[in-house]
Amino acid sequence: MIEFLSDIDTQLLLFFNGIHSPFWDYFMSAFTGKVIWVPMYASILYILLKNFHWKVALCYVVAIALTITFADQMCNSFLRPLVGRLRPSNPENPIADLVYIVNGRRGGGFGFPSCHAANSFGLAIFLICLFRKRWLSIFIVLWAFTNSYTRLYLGLHYPGDLVAGAIIGGFGGWLFYFIAHKLTARLQSDTPVPGKGAGMKQTEVMIYTGLLTLAGIIIYSIVQS
C-alpha cells in the first residue's frame, strides 16, 4: 500500500511539475518567496491593532509566531530527519533527472513534510478562526494553496509532502488560536470578540495588500518572460 501511494505521489508530481512555461517559472519563483509577502504580513498587524487593545493584539502576534514556529520545527527538525524522504529535486533521488528544475533551485535534503505548506496553512487557519470573514477566509486559503502548489511546480516537494504539511500547520493554527483566544478573554472583555466577524473592522486591507502584491508578481513575470 505504501509503495502504491508513493507511486501515485510520484506520478502526480511529475504531471504537475511538467506543466511549465517561462511566465510560470518566474511567477512561481516569486510567489514562493518570503520577503515579497512582508507587506501582507504587516497588514495583519495593522488589522489587529485596529480591532484590539495593544495587549490583546500582542498576544495574537505571539500566537501567530508560535504557530509558525510549531509548524516549522515539527516539520523541519522532527519529522524530516525521522522520515528521511528525499526531495524529488535532490540529485540523490532516483527521479531527480525527471524533475523540471527552475533556476537550478533544488532545496535541501529531505522534504517530508513541507514547511512551506505547514506555515502557509497554519497562518491561514489561525486568521480564519480569528477574523471569521468570508472573503478574507477565501483569499487566505487560496493564498496558502497557491503558496503550497509553487513547491510542487518547482519540483521541491511531492504532493504528499504538501498535504502532510498543511494538516500539521492547520492543527497548529487552530491550537494556538484556541489558546490565545482563552488568554485574551481575560485580558480585555470590551474589545471585539474573535468569532463574531461582524465586529471586525478593516479586514479587507489584508486582501487589498495581498492582491497588490499578486499584481506586482504578475507584472514582473510578464516582463521577465
From Swiss-Prot:
The chain crosses the membrane at residues 29-49, 51-71, 110-130, 136-156, 160-180, 203-223. Its EC number is 3.1.-.-. Disruption phenotype: No visible phenotype in the absence of host gut inflammation. Loss of resistance to the cationic antimicrobial peptide polymyxin B (PMB). Lipid A is bi- rather than mono-phosphorylated, with mass corresponding to a 1- 4'-phosphorylated molecule. Increased negative charge on the cell surface leading to greater binding of PMB, increased outer membrane disruption by PMB. Decreased survival (fitness) in host (mouse) cells after infection with C.rodentium (a mouse enteropathogen that induces inflammation) or in mice subjected to other inflammation-producing stimuli. One of its GO terms (molecular function) is hydrolase activity. Its main location: membrane. This is Lipid A 4'-phosphatase. Belongs to the lipid A LpxF 4'-phosphatase family. Keywords: Antibiotic resistance, Cell inner membrane, Cell membrane, Hydrolase, Lipid A biosynthesis, Lipid biosynthesis, Lipid metabolism, Lipopolysaccharide biosynthesis, Membrane, Transmembrane, Transmembrane helix. GO terms for biological process: lipid A biosynthetic process; lipopolysaccharide biosynthetic process; response to antibiotic. GO terms for cellular component: plasma membrane.
